Amino acid sequence: MPFEIWHGLEDGERLSLTQEAFWSFSQHFQLAKDDQSDLNPGNSIVVDQLEEARLKAKGLAINLSGIMTALDLLTPPANTPLGSVPLGDSVFERKCRGYVIIRDYSFWTDRAVTFLGELKAKYSE
């Protein structure tokens, strides 16, 4: 979503989109973790890092729901869990999928930090 559109949204809309994004990331990290386990079965370090990221994304989504409830905003329904939809079975496609998940997670994390800082300043007054 372009910067101009994002900043044109109301706080509730931005909270909702951010909550949905991190709930989705918690599910996508599970996919990446499963891929990594298959691609490198002897390397638990990356799998452990993906699990940690999955739990953090899920925790943030839950906390964002709490913020929305505290502000009397409707919380979006939980996303439909990802199924076993074929997203590419080659090693290259699976590695690319992991890269895209990490790249987008980084983008949304930066966006969330900035937005939540603005929200804190706004509601702390």
Predicted ranges, named:
Residues 1-103, 107-125:
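Long, contiguous alpha-helical bundle segments
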